[in-house]
């Protein structure tokens, strides 16, 4: 078992979390304390699930939950772009990070089935 903080998927998720904390500061008040907080919470939960999956004997269900979380994060990011809370450039950057995490989770899931 690898240390969780050495996993590429953990590192990519942590980088995504940092980026989310940076850009949610720019949200209008209406979105900062609703969608912004939900986005942060979902990303923190994603990182927690990656930790749990790494330390669990049966990883599959936890990885599936993590994949659900990354899709919710993707949805929130798209919503914030459509509501003009983040620029298209920022959305593309965040979406690349989300896609990177998603691909790694999918690969991890395939490796444990």
Residue map of PLM features:
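Amphipathic alpha-helical assembly/interaction segments
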Residues: 1-113
